[in-house]
Structures are given as C-alpha cells and as structure tokens.
C-alpha cells in the first residue's frame, strides 16, 4: 500500500534524511512499518522552525514532497494552486491520502482528490473550541471564527465519503453519525520500549513536579506556580520542572517568573526548554515524582498524560475535554478544579502524603496505558485503511 500523508507541521530533507518534529516523525515511522511506501506532503519549515525539527525519520520507505514555505494560513490558502499542482502530479501513485485534522488546507485538498483516490481524516481536535481564548482584537477574532467555521463545516461535510479516525470519545460519537467508516484510536508517541515500570514515587524531597507541553496560560501554569508557592509556605519542598516550547511574544514565562518572585521560589521553578519526544523527553518523566497539567479549556486527550502514565508517574489534571472519558478521579489520576491554585496545592499534598493511594494510581495508570502504543494504534489504523480501500 502506498500511503500519502498531509498535515501542517513542516519537514525538510538534508543529507538524505527527512527531519520533522518528533511526535510527527514517530507516528510516520510507525505507519511506514505496515506500508510499502509513505509519501509526505509537508511544508518547508522557516529558519526559526528548523531547530524544532530534530527527529530524523528512520524508515527508508518514506519520501518527502516539499510544499511551499510554512507561511501564515491566509497566504497558504492564497498560494494553494502551487500545492495543487504538486498533489496532482503524485495523486495517481497513491492508494489513499491520510490527513491529520484539523489542518488549514483540508477543504481544498479534499475537493481536489475526492472521487480520484480514497481519503482519510485523523481527527485530533476542534479549532472552534479555542477561538474564544485567542488573544486578538475582536475584528481579527471574527475573521478567525469565520475561517474556522468554513474549515470545520467542510471537514464534516466530506466525512461521509472518507475513513475517519477519531482521537477521542467525543469525536467518535460525533463522526460516527457523519460517516459509515469511523474508527476510534488513541494518538501517541509511545513505543513498547518506552515504558518505565516502578512501584512508587515521592520518596524524598524535594518532590519533582513535571509539566510538559506548550507553555501557555491556558495550561494552568500560573495556578500551578502559585500552588508550588503555597506548598513552600507550608514547608513542603517541591520543584516545578517545565519542559516545552513557548510561542513568540507570549507573556506566560515572564508571568510565571513574577509569581515565583512574589513567593520567593525563583530557584524552585526551572525552565528546561523544548525536548524531543523519545529518550531526551522521557528522561524527565523518569525523574519526576508527579505530573501535572491544569488545562482550562476543552481539548482532546493530551498525549503528555499517556507519556506520564507509561513512566509510572501519578497524574494530576483537570477533567476537561476527553480526559474525564478516559481517566477516573483517584483511580488512575487525581482531578483538580480549573483555574484553582488551592485545589492544585491540596492534590499535590494529598499524593505526597498518601503512599498507598499513590501506588494504586501508578498501577492503574499503567493498566490504562498498556495498549496505547504506536505498535498497536498504527497497526489498527493501517488495518482499517486496507479494509476501506479494498473493494
């Protein structure tokens, strides 16, 4: 089977190797294992983006069709005719095109390939859920909302003719009414070799609290920092390790440092920067006592939670989006209230002071995540694709 793949995250080729962001590269390599060939239709990164493209795709079955530079969304749409020519050149060689969604050019690409080759969507979220939280002038936000509505309505309209992979229970419930070919999957960066089994954490202070992901206020990082400060006042010694990337001009890091200064805990909040998925990132999970993500908005299930569970780290999280459909409070995670530093403080303290419950959560978490591996999920996807394209 010759699989095509498109998403808006870029990639580039250098010295005979294809480089992209780690979670995308791991996913592509895992698909390639079950395909004859995989052709990537991906944008070319800007110079600033290249430093994040640290994963070299391993499979020799993967080829890259480099699209235009990763311009802003309006410019990509305006210049789409250039991309159309590249896709048309390759279209007859593909058995199916898989698009991770949402992605800006999905409506245009689908329109061009529909009726010519089969297509599939891997639905990992909904842009409309995040428009209101965008920090833009109202007129800009109105334009963004119009674009998002256009993109999502086209995605839903075309779903009836494609194969849909849904990354959450909510997405599955929605798309199974729109498509006769809908499969629920769990996107992940985990391989079988990545699991780290241990019985317990929080054995000695300072307790290592870990956050991984995009550094933004919507992830609850200001409240998490405040909770660490409150624990400090109660003589509970914690370190907050923040691993991830921050968007240009985003004020979150400076606001975190301001709160840390107010509580006198500047030395207890450590920014480690962006780390690639794999051993570099997983070394932080192995050293962590607790993992926390305090998302304030509805979202899909964060793959960072899967990573924490697989590394035997107790998870503290808000039950937003798909999280409450997968995790159960005080069974395989501990829930906190959104935007509530006091709730965060109390749950961190609860896990530190209750080893029996902590061990139980670790074991239940490992049981929850045991089938969320690239080996299992990618084979499930490829098997579904082969069934879909076989008459």
Language-model region placement:
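Nucleotide-activated donor-binding/catalytic signature segment of Leloir-type glycosyltransferases, i.e.
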Residues: 253-275
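Conserved acidic donor-binding segment of nucleotide-sugar-dependent glycosyltransferases
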Residues: 329-330, 334-341, 350-356
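Short hydrophobic beta-strand element within catalytic cores of glycosyltransferases
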Residues: 305, 314-317
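Short alpha-helical donor nucleotide-sugar binding micro-motif in glycosyltransferases
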Residues: 91, 274, 283-288
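A short, well-ordered alpha-helix in the C-terminal region of glycosyltransferases
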Residues: 343, 350, 357-371, 380-383
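A short, active-site helix/loop in glycosyltransferases that binds the activated sugar's phosphate group
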Residues: 145-196
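A conserved mid-protein helix/loop that constitutes part of the nucleotide-sugar donor-binding site
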Residues: 207, 216-230, 254
């Amino acid at each position: 089977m010759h699989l095509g793949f498109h998403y808006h995250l870029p990639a580039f080729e250098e010295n005979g190797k294809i480089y992209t962001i780690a979670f995308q590269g791991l996913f592509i390599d895992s698909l390639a294992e079950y395909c004859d060939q995989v052709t990537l239709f991906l944008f070319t990164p800007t110079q600033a983006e290249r430093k994040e493209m640290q994963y070299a795709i391993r499979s020799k079955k993967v080829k890259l069709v480099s699209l235009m530079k990763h311009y802003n969304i309006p410019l990509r749409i305006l210049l789409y005719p250039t991309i159309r020519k590249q896709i048309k050149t390759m279209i007859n060689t593909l058995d199916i095109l898989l698009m991770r969604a949402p992605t800006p050019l999905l409506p245009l690409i689908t329109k061009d390939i529909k009726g010519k080759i089969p297509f599939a969507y891997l639905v990992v979220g909904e842009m409309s859920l995040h428009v209101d939280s965008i920090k833009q002038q109202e007129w800009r936000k109105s334009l963004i909302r119009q674009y998002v509505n256009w993109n999502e309505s086209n995605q839903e309209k075309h779903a009836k003719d494609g194969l849909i992979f849904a990354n959450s229970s909510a997405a599955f419930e929605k798309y199974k009414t729109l498509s006769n070919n809908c499969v629920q999957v769990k996107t992940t960066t985990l391989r079988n070799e990545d699991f780290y089994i241990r019985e317990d954490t929080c054995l000695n202070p300072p307790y290592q609290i870990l956050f991984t992901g995009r550094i933004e206020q919507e992830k609850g990082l200001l409240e998490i920092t405040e909770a660490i400060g409150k624990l400090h006042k109660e003589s509970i010694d914690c370190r907050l390790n923040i691993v991830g990337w921050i968007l240009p001009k985003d004020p979150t890091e400076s606001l975190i440092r301001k709160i840390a200064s107010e509580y006198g805990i500047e030395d207890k909040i450590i920014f480690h920067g962006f780390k690639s998925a794999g051993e570099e990132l997983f070394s932080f999970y192995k050293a962590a006592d607790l993992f926390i993500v305090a998302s304030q908005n509805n979202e899909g299930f964060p793959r960072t939670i899967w990573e924490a569970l697989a590394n035997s780290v107790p998870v503290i999280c808000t039950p937003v989006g798909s999280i409450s459909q997968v995790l159960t409070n005080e069974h395989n995670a501990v829930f906190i209230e959104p935007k509530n530093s006091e709730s965060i403080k109390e749950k961190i303290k609860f896990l530190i002071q209750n080893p029996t419950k902590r061990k139980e959560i670790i074991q239940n978490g490992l049981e929850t995540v045991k089938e969320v591996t690239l080996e299992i999920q990618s084979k499930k996807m490829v098997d579904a694709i082969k069934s879909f394209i076989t008459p």
